[in-house]
A protein has these predicted regions:
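Conserved ABC ATPase "signature" region
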Residues: 5-23
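ABC ATPase nucleotide-binding domains
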Residues: 119, 127-152
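H-loop (His-switch) and adjacent beta-strand-loop-beta switch element
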Residues: 101-114
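Conserved catalytic motifs of ABC-family nucleotide-binding domains
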Residues: 48
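Conserved ABC ATPase signature
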Residues: 27-31, 35
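Catalytic Walker B motif of ABC-type/P-loop ATPase nucleotide-binding domains
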Residues: 52-56
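H-loop/switch region of ABC-family ATPase nucleotide-binding domains
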Residues: 88-89
Length: 152
């Protein structure tokens, strides 16, 4: 019996983790936006990174696709204990799905947990009181502490 190479086993594990097993034989050009994002995410996990850098990862996804993608990111974050740096202009999703926010406007205006950032005077001056008040703020769904690593 032939031994299955470790690389094949690793790829199958990632395909299961990102729910792309049924997509492996399909050409990329026929995939939906959400399917394509999951394939790209799976590809980025192959090297077992400690950090994922995502630039507008939910762009061009409908709202249900965005929610599914962010849930998948949360699962990967939890299971792999990796860090995720995400660039996004979608303030509602950022505030609802992240644990730490860095707000940039020519410089770092403010940073911290979403509920702190939305009250920061620089955030309020950029987006106004109404925007700050209507931001959906992330509600952490389980009870434990996270180790935070700040690198200056």
């Amino acid at each position: 019996m032939a031994r299955v190479p470790e690389r094949v086993i690793a790829i199958e594990k990632i395909a299961d983790e990102t729910n792309i097993k049924s997509l492996l034989e399909k050409p990329v050009h026929v995939l939906s936006g959400g399917e394509r994002q999951r394939v790209l995410l799976a590809r980025s996990l192959i090297g077992n990174p400690e950090l994922l850098v995502l630039d507008e990862p939910a762009q061009n996804l409908d709202i249900s696709g965005q929610l599914a993608f962010y849930k998948l990111l949360e699962q990967i974050y939890q299971s792999r204990s990796l860090s995720i740096l995400m660039v996004s202009h979608d303030l509602h999703m950022v505030m609802a799905t992240t644990k730490k926010v860095v707000c940039l406007f020519h410089h770092i205006c403010c940073s911290g947990e979403p509920q702190i950032v939305t009250k920061d005077p620089e955030f309020v001056s950029l987006f106004g009181n109404d925007m700050a008040e209507m931001m959906a703020v992330y509600q952490h769904g389980h009870n434990h502490t996270h180790e935070v690593h700040d690198h200056d």
